[in-house]
């Protein structure tokens, strides 16, 4: 059945359990979604791609409970849940394990004095680079103008990633395989246009 892990102070033990299950599953590829919210994309992706393993990470109890309930109701067997901050276990993963990492609508922390609370930071990007396969992609979405600039600034600081956009439509139009989440629909209703950024991991220059 579905794999999910409760908070555990022994992080090395918990990540060891996760890694053992990753090996046991023998998936075609592994995709990480950070901050899955209501789980719309996570659930749809897993149902459409049963040979792909999805690891969802979200620190909020309510979202975890709803998502785990849906996983069990639909008998989805290719989702694992880390119900906490991904930064607590990111260093435990082997290098080059994820084919894709999704970060949809992270908290923008718009005030300048709170900028260090934003998930996207130089050090965190280094961690993501290490666990992402070469030519793997990071997909980010945001509806906040400050966060749009911040994402581009942080990624431009790291020569290991290449922004894939060639035209404005590449970041204005949602990738075809993503579903509209409740948060995204609310943003559009309130006239906040979501922007979609895709960065590919390349060898550092």
What kind of feature is each model-predicted range?
Residues 153, 158-205:
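Class I S-adenosyl-L-methionine
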Residues 1-30, 40-47, 69-95:
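S-adenosyl-L-methionine
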Residues 35-38:
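Class I SAM-dependent methyltransferase "Motif I" SAM/SAH-binding loop
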